[in-house]
């Protein structure tokens, strides 16, 4: 990633140089005037440009038009700005403007670049039956580099959600034929939690209760049409920042800090509530309990850092092998569990034995060289008992695998 900074103040340039190096660590080119900036723009591709509005040889903001003409996102720095200039800049399509007041202003500019970097990977679905409104929202989002997908009504939006993965934000109008914004949100919330997707409602109606009704139905925020550019961007950024924070909290609570697979807490909270239904419907459900053979010897011989590398790689192989269809969790230490919903013990045994053989045949690469690692596994399937009892039976089978020589899969009888 390469950034262009156009600023005639050496003090401001030094501050930005320091902050960018500290926060972004990317390549930065500096220009003091319009002439030198044009030369740099002609010879490099830039991710974003941070430009002073008034330069010694271009007092009317010509640099902004030059940057935007080359389809480079532009963040404008200025010592002063009246309402007409502000409106003109926003209509040109800049990312944002920042008044040069103190160090916080420059920190904000650098944070904005980081947000743009993140936004490249954020998918946003816009549902609105008005082509004009939809295209306007799309243009605002694309100024901040979001990936934008359009739907012309609620039913089309549901079709998109069925086919597109990783949509993080839904922006939906209220009045739409077929399925309105409220109905769309209710259906979306049946499938996606607040940790998985954020929703912003839009409407031009004068009904003052709309904002509360949107939020009660499951939206994160509401915006009344017509809205100004800045309010829209602030609402979107705040909503996505909140989504990121909620996700981080959820991950801290439910993912293992080292291996990033699920933890014991998540495993029990997910499957304990399901167990009575699985028993009543006689749905097949099995668990495999895995233990890395002689893991203490790895730590004693090579040190705990190498031991951590082995745990991380072992967990990644489990995720690659099972994670698409089944749940992988770390129970603690070198012990992991795989939950096989829909599989009986015999089928789970077959898959786990294949994983065991693959692991034994493929050494784990560490910073201290390759290590031959094997695993012992115990399998048990649900027979009307509790989750604790099911795990205990898998643990007994795991003990049998160890006692029988390790690098084995044993199934609970």
In which residue ranges do the predicted regions lie?
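A short pre-motif secondary-structure segment
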Residues: 327-330, 371
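Hydrophobic framework residues that shape the active-site pocket
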Residues: 291, 295, 314, 331, ...
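Active-site-proximal structural segments of metal-dependent nucleotidyl cyclase/transferase enzymes
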Residues: 270-302, 318, 329
């Amino acid at each position: 990633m390469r950034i262009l900074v156009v600023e005639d103040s050496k003090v401001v340039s030094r501050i930005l140089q320091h902050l960018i190096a500290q926060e972004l660590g990317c390549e930065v080119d500096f220009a003091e005037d319009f002439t030198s900036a044009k030369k740099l723009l002609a010879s490099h591709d830039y991710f974003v440009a941070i430009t002073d509005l008034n330069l010694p040889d271009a007092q009317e903001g010509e640099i902004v038009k030059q940057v935007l003409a080359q389809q480079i996102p532009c963040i404008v720095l200025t010592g002063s700005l009246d309402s007409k200039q502000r409106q003109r800049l926003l209509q040109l399509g800049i990312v944002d403007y920042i008044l040069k007041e103190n160090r916080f202003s420059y920190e904000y500019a650098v944070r904005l670049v980081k947000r743009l970097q993140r936004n490249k990977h954020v998918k946003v679905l816009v549902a609105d039956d008005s082509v004009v409104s939809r295209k306007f929202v799309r243009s605002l989002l694309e100024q901040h580099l979001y990936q934008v997908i359009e739907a012309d009504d609620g039913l089309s939006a549901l079709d998109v959600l069925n086919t597109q993965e990783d949509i993080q934000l839904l922006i939906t109008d209220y009045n739409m034929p077929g399925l309105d914004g409220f109905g769309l949100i209710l259906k979306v919330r049946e499938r996606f939690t607040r940790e998985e997707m954020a929703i912003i409602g839009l409407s031009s109606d004068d009904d003052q209760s709309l904002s509360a009704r949107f939020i009660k139905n499951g939206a994160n925020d509401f915006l009344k049409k017509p809205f100004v550019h800045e309010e829209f961007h602030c609402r979107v950024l705040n909503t996505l920042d909140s989504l990121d924070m909620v996700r981080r909290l959820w991950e801290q609570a439910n993912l293992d800090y080292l291996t990033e697979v699920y933890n014991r807490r998540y495993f029990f909270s997910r499957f304990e509530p399901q167990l009575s239904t699985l028993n009543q419907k006689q749905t097949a459900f099995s668990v495999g309990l895995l233990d890395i053979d002689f893991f203490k010897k790895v730590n004693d011989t090579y040190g705990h850092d190498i031991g951590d590398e082995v745990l991380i790689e072992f967990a990644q192989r489990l995720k690659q092998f099972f994670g698409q269809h089944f749940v992988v969790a770390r129970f603690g230490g070198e012990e992991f569990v795989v939950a096989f919903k829909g599989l009986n013990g015999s089928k789970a045994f077959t898959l786990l034995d294949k994983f065991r053989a693959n692991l034994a045949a493929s050494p784990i690469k560490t910073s201290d060289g390759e290590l031959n690692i094997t695993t012992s596994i115990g399998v048990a399937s649900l027979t009307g008992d509790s989750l604790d009892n099911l795990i205990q039976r898998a643990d007994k089978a795991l003990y049998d695998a160890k006692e029988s020589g390790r690098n084995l899969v044993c199934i609970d009888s």
